[in-house]
Amino acid sequence: GERIPFEFQLIVYGSSNEYKTVGNIFKEDLAKIGVKMVVSPMEWANLLKKVDAREFDAITLAWVSGPPVDFRQIWHSSQADLPKGSNRVGFRNAEADKIIEALELEFDDGKRKKLAQQFHQLLYEEQPYTFFYTRKTKVFWQPELKNVWFQLVRPHINPRPFYLGG
């Protein structure tokens, strides 16, 4: 077949050495398969303008979610056209919307987990984002601490009060 050159720009937060390093690693890896990626560091205010206007090929961003996770804000179709909204890529998917709506009404942890797994599978198949990595987090615990509960998302944050046993 005919070889068609592929080139795109990756915008990274210019003050972040981490994002610049990750961008350059991807650039080198993509070059090995004939893809040209231009890493463009940009200051935060300019980066946000590009994101809000959806003027980018690819961009590095970090999502930090608190418990419980709110899938609607980032993934629901109703959020896709909101100016300066969190559904940055304009993702729309009727099945995703149904799962999100079911999650908002479900309180059983086991059922919520299954719905979240269905949702994650759908994101994997649709690929509106490519998730590169999650930072490692260290968490400590001592038996003297009572009422300690670690959540799956951001286990280092515990909104429940704990106390020393005695």
List each model region and its residues.
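Short, well-ordered beta-strand elements
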Residues: 4-15, 37-40, 57, 158
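Short helix-initiation/N-cap motifs at beta->coil->alpha
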Residues: 39-49
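Flexible hinge/switch segments at interdomain interfaces of large molecular machines
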Residues: 1-3, 90
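Detector for C-terminal structural segments
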Residues: 14, 18-28, 48-166
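Short alpha-helix C-terminal cap/hinge motif
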Residues: 25-39
